């Protein structure tokens, strides 16, 4: 699925949580320490001889502006090109010699750099992460070389219609806000980004109050804290709200007309909620009830939902996948699809009927099945030190803490049928539909028609 999508959790009232006794699920404790400069260290000792350790930064494309969009992603490319202490070749050789693996990725709200290594090489790995993050050489020749690499990456993204759909959707539904920016940035800015732009972004956003050092695997918390003090202890705190501009959802209908495409690629959405909104877990249950289907891969890891079973009978529908994307103050919830033009009406009507069913007719048996599936999926996502490390870092940035598994289980179990119906009614039936489609777009109806269909179904 779209690599920049994310699910979220929410904070319910203690009254609701108290009604449910958490089931016993053994998971190691996540320990968190905050250094005097605001830099947070979070670890989970899952055992073993290897570990994953990463730096998670509250800085992504939404913290950019119309003059430097693409800088966060450009920095991701530059991080591995050398520092005053380590040449590019020396860095690559050092990482290889200790048997480590370095990686990085950028999203709209955050940037992550992490290393997978043997436990005895954790200190050296943190040294490397700190060095490439804070002391990158940003040599002109390397900037020019990576400029070409990024432009080629942009050309590849332009051929990935799934990426295109979500980029044009964000561009219109959050128009006028940095959340609308693409992660790679426009080509005209990529061609002009220079060392001053890159260094300025580091100085502004790579601050201790906006960073988390997370580790999972065979790790000792006190030892990791000492590493953080050694390599990040002198980092300035910074302002956690720097250049954050709250986004407003604006209903849109955006079309990328490509007449030669045999299929229509698109997303139909309504406004979702933020990471911390009290309705988010209910929407995650609803998302599970919507389901997914891919003609090449089947129904995914879960049993097919009623919507998936219905759409699988239509030979013109290649892919549909529900999603719940969360940001700090808003979100998008809906369905991504790949379908033949003659199947579009069936697809739209089937999704709308499912929305109405969720809001008006969902029963306890279906909700219970969805909650069990959600429990299982969330636990399966944490198989290995790398996904655990990523989950720790993400939750620290989103919630300020790691939500314990028993607490999360209790929150999911506390969702009632009526609560789910109420949330789905507010979000799906009372929300305003937006759509982004690529292909033979004349086969996609206008938003007013879709809204009219939804009204008639109720």
From Swiss-Prot:
UniProt site (Required for the specific determination of the substrate cleavage site): 163, 167
Keywords assigned: Hydrolase, Metal-binding, Metalloprotease, Mitochondrion, Protease, Transit peptide, Zinc
UniProt-recorded Gene Ontology molecular function terms: metal ion binding; metalloendopeptidase activity
UniProt xrefs under InterPro entries: Metalloenz_LuxS/M16 (IPR011249), MPP/UQCRC_Complex (IPR050361), Pept_M16_N (IPR011765), Pept_M16_Zn_BS (IPR001431), Peptidase_M16_C (IPR007863)
GO biological process, one term: protein processing involved in protein targeting to mitochondrion
Reported cofactor(s): Zn(2+)
Catalytic residue list: 76
Locations listed in the record: Mitochondrion matrix
Protease is among the record's keywords: yes
Chain segment of the transit peptide: 1-41
Cofactor note: Binds 1 zinc ion per subunit.
Matching SUPFAM superfamilies: LuxS/MPP-like metallohydrolase
Protein's job: Catalytic subunit of the essential mitochondrial processing protease (MPP), which cleaves the mitochondrial sequence off newly imported precursors proteins. Preferentially, cleaves after an arginine at position P2.
Subunit composition and interactions: Heterodimer of mppa-1 (alpha) and mppb-1 (beta) subunits, forming the mitochondrial processing protease (MPP) in which mppa-1 is involved in substrate recognition and binding and mppb-1 is the catalytic subunit.
Protein name in UniProt: Mitochondrial-processing peptidase subunit beta
């Amino acid at each position: 699925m779209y690599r920049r999508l994310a699910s979220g959790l929410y904070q319910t009232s203690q009254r609701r949580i108290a009604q449910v006794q958490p089931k016993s699920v053994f998971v190691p404790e996540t320990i968190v320490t905050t250094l005097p400069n605001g830099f947070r260290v979070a670890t989970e000792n899952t055992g073993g001889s290897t570990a994953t350790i990463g730096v998670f930064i509250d800085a992504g494309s939404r913290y950019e502006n119309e003059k430097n969009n693409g800088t966060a992603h450009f920095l991701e490319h530059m991080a591995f090109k050398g520092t005053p202490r380590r040449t590019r070749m020396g860095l690559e050789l050092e990482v290889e010699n200790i048997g480590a693996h370095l990686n990085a990725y950028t999203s709209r709200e955050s940037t992550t750099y992490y290393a997978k290594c043997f436990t005895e090489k954790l200190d050296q790995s943190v040294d490397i992460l700190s060095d490439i993050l804070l002391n990158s050489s940003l040599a002109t020749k390397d900037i020019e070389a990576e400029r070409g690499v990024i432009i080629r990456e942009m050309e590849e993204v332009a051929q990935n219609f799934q990426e295109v759909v979500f980029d044009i959707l964000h561009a219109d539904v959050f128009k006028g806000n940095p959340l609308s920016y693409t992660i790679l940035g426009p080509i005209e800015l990529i061609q002009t980004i220079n060392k001053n732009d890159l260094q300025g972004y580091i100085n502004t956003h790579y601050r201790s109050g906006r960073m988390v050092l997370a580790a999972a695997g065979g790790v000792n918390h006190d030892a990791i804290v000492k590493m953080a003090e050694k390599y990040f202890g002198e980092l300035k705190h910074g302002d956690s709200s720097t250049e954050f501009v709250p986004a407003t959802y604006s209903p849109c209908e955006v079309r990328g007309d490509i007449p030669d495409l045999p299929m229509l690629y698109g997303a139909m959405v309504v406004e979702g909620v933020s990471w911390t909104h009290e309705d988010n877990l209910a929407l995650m249950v609803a998302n599970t009830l919507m389901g997914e289907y891919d003609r090449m891969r089947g129904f995914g890891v879960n049993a097919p939902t009623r919507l998936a079973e219905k759409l699988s009978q239509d030979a013109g529908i290649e892919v549909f996948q529900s999603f719940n994307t969360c940001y700090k103050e808003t979100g998008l919830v809906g369905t991504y699809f790949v379908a033949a033009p003659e199947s579009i009406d069936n697809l739209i009507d089937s999704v709308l009927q499912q929305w109405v069913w969720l809001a008006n007719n969902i029963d306890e048996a279906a909700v219970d099945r969805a909650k069990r599936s959600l429990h299982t999926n969330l636990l399966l996502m944490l198989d290995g030190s790398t996904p655990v490390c990523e989950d720790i870092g993400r939750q620290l940035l989103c919630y300020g803490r790691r939500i314990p598994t028993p607490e999360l289980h209790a929150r999911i179990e506390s969702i009632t049928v009526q609560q789910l119906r109420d949330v789905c009614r507010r979000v799906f039936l009372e929300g305003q539909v937006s759509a982004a489609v690529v292909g033979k777009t004349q086969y996609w109806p206008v938003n007013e028609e879709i809204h009219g269909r939804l009204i008639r179904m109720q």
